Curated annotation (Swiss-Prot):
Signal peptide: none
Induction: By stressful environmental conditions such as salt stress, AgNO(3), and sulfur deficiency.
Alphabetical list of InterPro entries matching this protein: LSU
Gene name of the encoded protein: LSU1
Protein name per UniProt: Protein RESPONSE TO LOW SULFUR 1
Record lineage: Eukaryota, Viridiplantae, Streptophyta, Embryophyta, Tracheophyta
PANTHER family: PROTEIN RESPONSE TO LOW SULFUR 1
Coiled-coil annotated residue ranges, if any: 8-35
Record's keyword annotation contains Coiled coil: yes
Keywords, alphabetical: Coiled coil
């Protein structure tokens, strides 16, 4: 009978250890859930920031393209003016 009592004691100790471990694991799971929620929230913020930056970049690309076209048009205009002035000065010199 002593052995049975010993088995019962061991089983009770094992149960207590399993309960403690279960509580510990439950706490760890709760902490991990909290951390996961924080990471998810940061991910959402980062995605929103990325979208905003992409939008701003697209606007800047459009603006720079417009400026490049304006610059190109201005260069063509000035080259035409120089060409006209050069040809008119040649005609005037003759």
């Amino acid at each position: 009978m002593a052995n049975r009592g010993g088995c019962v004691t061991v089983a009770a100790e094992e149960m207590d250890e399993l309960r403690r471990r279960n509580i510990e694991l439950s706490r760890e799971v709760a902490e991990m859930k909290t951390e996961m929620i924080k990471l998810w929230q940061r991910t959402v913020v980062a995605e929103e920031a990325e979208e905003q930056l992409c939008s701003q970049l697209a606007e800047l690309e459009v603006e720079s393209l417009e400026q490049a076209r304006d610059y190109h048009d201005r260069m063509l205009f000035l080259m035409d003016q120089i060409s006209r002035l050069s040809s008119s000065s040649v005609v005037s010199s003759s």
